[in-house]
Amino acid sequence: MAGAATQASLESAPRIMRLVAECSRSRARAGELWLPHGTVATPVFMPVGTQATMKGITTEQLDALGCRICLGNTYHLGLRPGPELIQKANGLHGFMNWPHNLLTDSGGFQMVSLVSLSEVTEEGVRFRSPYDGNETLLSPEKSVQIQNALGSDIIMQLDDVVSSTVTGPRVEEAMYRSIRWLDRCIAAHQRPDKQNLFAIIQGGLDADLRATCLEEMTKRDVPGFAIGGLSGGESKSQFWRMVALSTSRLPKDKPRYLMGVGYATDLVVCVALGCDMFDCVFPTRTARFGSALVPTGNLQLRKKVFEKDFGPIDPECTCPTCQKHSRAFLHALLHSDNTAALHHLTVHNIAYQLQLMSAVRTSIVEKRFPDFVRDFMGAMYGDPTLCPTWATDALASVGITLG
């Protein structure tokens, strides 16, 4: 296996991350990603737009909130509208009129989310389209080819994804296959000077398999690494231990992207564990259920208690929704057939995530991150000592106590 890395690592990958500050107690770090469409401050939360758009928010609004990188989905974009059409629009940036950075996933996650429509072999993943029923093969080469056509700033290797609750030989098979597919992705990548290919660490909840994957993949000189195969139903205790194992063995000078994580507590804890980048559909999805994210958790604005509440969602939030609209107004909209409330809540929830990560970053730079964590947990749970046990244990493992 080690021999396969030699050819794949012939050309030195660009260094796209500059560390600005590090927490002296935990593994938390603040940095900058130097990408083709501008600098991105880290830690960073990246909103998810499956098909070249966010649900409930425009690119102009996303820009105004300060978002400098968001996600697109290779599998869905590859099927519809298709890479050929997007390429004619000067890539995904031109197609969606987005002036900042884009990260496209490889399509591998659809092995889990569309498991009834997919079949995995060494060749790749054979899908049956949810749109027209036609069969298509997504190989490592095809995934990279589509992402090269899309022109995203960060592209992801195709990995063999299994649910985090799966155990046994399938997990080992997927881990080793992901290493082989990484080499095929590196070989197929036509634009390494303009698009940064990230590897994805697999291995499920097996520490030995994760360690093997980390050892092999870090031999490949790629610009960054993602931690995959988590946030899929495993216990939080299992989750944080796999994250901590991964960050302890990933290169310090390269970005660490924890895939599929978006709950506020998870973000803060995983920054402490050493992660730099996060994505999740949670803030937009929860908005569609009438839920607004706030420092104390969330507000279910459909509830009658908000019917005559004329305050903003969050008095400290600077987003357009909080500046212009009351809880009572949003409550009324949610009980009508008007979809505007979902739009307003999406704007707020994404703003909340971005503002949270900005505050986390500032606390790292100002060398007060442990105090920030205690204040955050105190607001979220009423008292930092009432924080969930898994989070307390995870933070203690990197030197942050909540008592």
UniProtKB/Swiss-Prot annotation:
Broad EC category: transferase
Stretches the record annotates as RNA binding: 260-266, 284-288
Annotated SUPFAM superfamilies: tRNA-guanine transglycosylase
Binding site for queuine: 105, 159, 202, 229
Chain positions found as Phosphoserine: 139
General function of this protein: Catalytic subunit of the queuine tRNA-ribosyltransferase (TGT) that catalyzes the base-exchange of a guanine (G) residue with queuine (Q) at position 34 (anticodon wobble position) in tRNAs with GU(N) anticodons (tRNA-Asp, -Asn, -His and -Tyr), resulting in the hypermodified nucleoside queuosine (7-(((4,5-cis-dihydroxy-2-cyclopenten-1-yl)amino)methyl)-7-deazaguanosine). Catalysis occurs through a double-displacement mechanism. The nucleophile active site attacks the C1' of nucleotide 34 to detach the guanine base from the RNA, forming a covalent enzyme-RNA intermediate.
Protein name: Queuine tRNA-ribosyltransferase catalytic subunit 1
Organism: Homo sapiens
Gene behind this protein: QTRT1
